[in-house]
């Protein structure tokens, strides 16, 4: 009960905190307006991290990650994948929207690429940029590597790791960290085996960390799946990886 009250108070207070520390950035994909967020330390020529949010678009988990990354000395930019007027309002619409970009992966890669350009415009050092993504965004992190986007590393956090097996595996020069919960029903042993095969065939520098007693959205404090201990471990693993490849 006390934990629930404290969590509610924290989440209520973070709205004001986020609004003060993250700046809106409008950008375009043709006629489609996109609305991203960037940390306040822009223009300082620092390593950069692009954050790809979960299937409902920019949320508190992505915002928390951005503010924490700023404390670690990174410029962080949260991408808007869907665009103004297309943000899902429920699980059904989120599933359809995310499903479209998973199927049309080149469109997903393009939206990620446009967000990377905004990150660079806001001061990120071009050859010191990484991508992290949650859930649907974790899929995007892997697509960044598959698409040879100009980033040195990606972190997929409880992402969908599978891809259409009709797609050919290609070379992968991006360093890859996959953080997946052991009890994620959306990821099968076959998905793991296919990903490992893909990474090995691409001669990638990869690692997979699996978190015990954890379900799909184990890193999200708002989710019933939240596992505080494992979420902290996953975040520390993310920071360690980013420090290795960006600092």
Task: State where each predicted segment sits.
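A conserved short beta-strand
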Residues: 150-160
């Amino acid at each position: 009960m006390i934990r629930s009250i404290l969590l509610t108070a924290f989440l209520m207070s973070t709205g004001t905190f986020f609004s003060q520390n993250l700046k809106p950035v409008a950008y375009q994909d043709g006629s489609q307006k996109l609305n991203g967020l960037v940390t306040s330390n822009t223009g300082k020529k620092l390593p950069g991290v692009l954050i790809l949010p979960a299937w409902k678009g920019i949320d508190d988990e992505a915002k928390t990650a951005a503010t924490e990354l700023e404390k670690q000395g990174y410029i962080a930019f949260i991408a808007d994948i869907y665009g103004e007027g297309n943000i899902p309002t429920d699980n059904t619409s989120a599933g359809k929207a995310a499903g479209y970009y998973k199927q049309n992966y080149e469109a997903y890669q393009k939206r990620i690429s446009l967000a990377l350009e905004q990150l660079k415009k806001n001061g990120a050092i071009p050859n010191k940029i990484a991508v992290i993504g949650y859930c649907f965004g974790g899929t995007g992190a892997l697509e960044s590597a598959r698409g040879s986007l100009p980033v040195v590393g990606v972190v997929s956090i409880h992402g969908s790791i599978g891809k259409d097996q009709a797609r050919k595996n290609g070379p992968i020069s991006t360093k890859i960290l996959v953080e997946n919960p052991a009890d994620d029903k959306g990821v099968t042993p076959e998905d793991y085996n296919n990903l490992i095969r893909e990474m090995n065939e691409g001669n990638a520098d990869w690692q997979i960390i699996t978190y015990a007693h954890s379900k799909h959205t184990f890193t999200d404090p708002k989710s019933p799946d939240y596992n505080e201990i494992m979420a902290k471990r996953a975040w520390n693993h993310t920071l360690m990886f980013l420090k290795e490849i960006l600092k």
